[in-house]
Amino acid sequence: MRTAEITRNTNETRIRVAVNLDGTGKQTLDTGVPFLDHMLDQIARHGLIDLDIKAEGDLHIDAHHTVEDVGITLGMAIAKAVGDKAGLRRYGHAYVPLDEALSRVVIDFSGRPGLEYHIPFTRARIGDFDVDLTREFFQGLVNHALVTLHIDNLRGVNAHHQCETVFKAFGRALRMALELDPRMGGAVPSTKGVL
C-alpha cells in the first residue's frame, strides 16, 4: 500500500494529512473551510484515494493560509506515498463536465513542479470562499508533490460548477497517473531512469 502521513505546523496553521493512494475514496475532512472540504471530497472520490485531513488555521484573518497550507501538506504526502515512482503510469488526464461547465486537467509526475492555471471564474466568491484560493491550493500542491499540472476550465457560467469540474478532473487525472502499469516491470517511466 502506498500511504503517507505528514504533519506540518507553522505560526499560521497546524495541518495533518494522511493519504492512501491505493484506497477507495474514503475521506475524513475537517479544514475549517467547508467549500475546501467539499472540493477535497471530489479529489478523494474521483481519485479513489483515501484522505484524512485535519487543519487548524488563522481563519479569523481569512482562509488563505489554511487553503494554501493544505495544498502544500497534501502535495508533500502524495510525494512521500509515491516514492521512487517505479512502475508508475506517470501521466494522467481527464475532462469532466458538470451541466454547462467543462474542465480539463493534465498531470505529469515529472519531478519538476509547474502549474499552468486557466480558470476564468465568473464571480469572485463561491459562498464565503474566495476563488483566488483555488490557485493557491494547487500551487502549493504542485510545488511539494513535484508535478507538472495543467488546469483549464474550458467553459462555464456557474462558478461553483467551474471549480467542482476542476477538482473532479484533478482527481481523475491523479488516479490515472498514479496507476501502476504491470507492463513497466517496476521500471521508472523516464529515459533518465529517475524522476
From Swiss-Prot:
The UniProt record lists the keyword Lyase: yes
Gene3D superfamilies reported in the protein's UniProt record: Imidazole glycerol phosphate dehydratase, domain 1
GO cellular component: cytoplasm
GO molecular function, one term: imidazoleglycerol-phosphate dehydratase activity
Pathway(s) where this gene product acts: Amino-acid biosynthesis; L-histidine biosynthesis; L-histidine from 5-phospho-alpha-D-ribose 1-diphosphate: step 6/9
Enzyme kind, highest EC tier: lyase
Family matches, as InterPro entries: IGPD_sf, ImidazoleglycerolP_deHydtase, ImidazoleglycerP_deHydtase_CS, Ribosomal_Su5_D2-typ_SF
Protein's cellular compartments: Cytoplasm
EC numbers for this chain: 4.2.1.19
UniProt KW keywords: Amino-acid biosynthesis, Cytoplasm, Histidine biosynthesis, Lyase
Name of the protein in its database record: Imidazoleglycerol-phosphate dehydratase
Organism (species): Bordetella petrii (strain ATCC BAA-461 / DSM 12804 / CCUG 43448)
Source species taxonomy: Bacteria, Pseudomonadati, Pseudomonadota, Betaproteobacteria, Burkholderiales
